[in-house]
Amino acid sequence: MKNIVFAAVLFTAAFILTASRPVKVVFNELYRPQYHFSPERNYMGNPSGLVFIDGEYHMFYQHNPKGNEEGFSHLGHAYSTDLIHWEHMPVAIFPDNLSEDKDFCTALPGSAFVDHNNVLGFQKGPQKSLVVFYTSSGCGQRMAYSHDKGQTWNKYPGNPVIPYDSTDHAANPKVLWHEPTSKWVMLLYRMPGNDERKQGFSFYTSDNLVDWEYQSHLAGFFKSPDLTELRVNNRPDDTRWVLTEGEGEYILGSFDGKKFTPESIRMKSDWGKNYSASQNWSNIPASDGRTIQLAGMTGGEWTGMPFQGQMTFPCELSLKKINTGIFLIRQPVKEIEQLYQKEYSWKNENLIPGLGHNLIKKIGGDCLRIKGRFDLKNCESFGLMLRTGKKTQGTELVYNVKRETLSLLGQTVPLSPVDNKIHLDILLDRSSVEVFANNGRAAISCNIFNQENDKGYILFNTGGELLVEELEIYEMKSIWEAAE
C-alpha cells in the first residue's frame, strides 16, 4: 500500500511539474514564418525601437506576454548579427507604476538609439548606453536605458519626459540626432485638442534628452513617425528627407532641425493590408551606408498557433528619379541570399495562353523567393497563383495590362511597365507574401493562411503572348535552429 501511495505522489508531482512548464516552441508550426521574425509565443505588434550596436541589430517590439491578444503591452526584445537569424531575449520594458491593467501605463511603441556622448550621464565603463523612448499609455512619454546592450534596463527616474495630456493622444516618440544643428529631435504623433483634422506629427528639440522644446506641427499623418535623409540616385549632393507614417505612406521634403517642409505629394510605399508602422534602424555604421527598414505585419489570424504576429523582411531604402518624379525604393536586404537552397531558373520562355502549359508546375513548397522579369508582349494580363492545392485555387497575384495595376488579396497598386516589362520579386513564407514590383518601386505585404499541403504554383497569362525573359525561384532555409 505504501508503494502505491508513493508512486501516486511521484506521478502527481511529475504531472504538476510538467504542466507548469511552458510548451516548448518548435518553430515549425503550420503558420510559423520560417524566414521572417516572429515571437516565441504570445502577441507581437509593431516595431518599438530598432538600433545597431557593436555588430548587433537590436529589435524591440510591442508584446503581450500574457496571451495572443493585444493589450498588457510590454516591449519585447531580440537581436541579430546578420538581420536574418534572431536571438529572443527577455522582455525589456515592463508597464509603468506597477500597472497590471490591460491598457493603463502599458509600454507602447517608440524608438531606440545609442547615447554615444553620454548625454544622460548614465554610462558605466566603456560600454555605451542604449536608450529607448516609449509611450506609457495614459502616463506620458518615457525613457529607459541599458548599460549592457539591452540585457537589463533602468527606467529614467524623472519620467515622464513629456507628461500625459488627455487632449492630444500623444504616442510613438521617434528620437534622432540632427547633426547640422547639434540637437536631439523628437517626432511625436499628436491629435491637438482631440481634433482629427489636426492629427499629425509634432517636432521637439533637446540638448540633453530630458528637457524638450516644442518647435512645430505637421498635420495630416497617422501614428508611427520616422524621418531620414536619403540620397537621390545615390548622389551625395542631392538629398531629400523622407517622412514616413504608420500606414505605409511617405512624403519627401526638407528639414531644418525644427520644421519639416513638404516638397512632394503623399505617396504610398506599401499597399498591403497587413503592413504596419515601419521603422528604420538607427546607428548603422557609415561603412555600411544603408538605411534599413522593418515593419510589422498585423491584423492576421494565426489560429491555433502559440504566437500572434510577425515582422516584414528587412528592406534597404533608397530614393530614385523615375521620369519626372522621385520615389522611395524598398528592396529586401542582400543578406537574404544566405538562405537560398535549391534554385530553379528559366530564360526567354514564350508563353501562349490556352495551351494548358504551366512553366512552374514542378515547383512546390511554402517558403520561396520568386524573382522574374516579364515582357508583356501582347497579353492582357499575367500573374501567379500562389499556394494552390487539390481543393484550393490559391492566392492570385495578377497584373492587368490595360489598367496598369497589380492586385493581390483585394489590394490594387498602380504600376506602369518599364520598356513594356514588369519586374516582380516575391517573398513567400508560411503565413505571408511580400511583393516588390519594378525593383522596389511599389510593394504589397499581406498575410496568407493556407492548408499544409497547398504548395503548388501556376504562372498564367491571358489574351496574348507573354515572354518570361528571366525567372528565378529559390527554396528558402529556415532561420530557426529548432525547425531543422
Where are these regions (language model features)?
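Generic cytosolic/nucleocytoplasmic N-terminal low-complexity/intrinsically disordered segments
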Residues: 1-2, 239, 437
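Structured, non-membrane catalytic/scaffold regions adjacent to prosthetic-group chemistry
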Residues: 279
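Beta-rich accessory regions
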Residues: 256-273, 282-484
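Beta-rich carbohydrate-recognition and catalytic domains
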Residues: 20-173, 177-225, 229-273, 288, ...
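Bacterial Sec-dependent signal peptides at the C-terminal "C-region" and cleavage site
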Residues: 3, 7-25
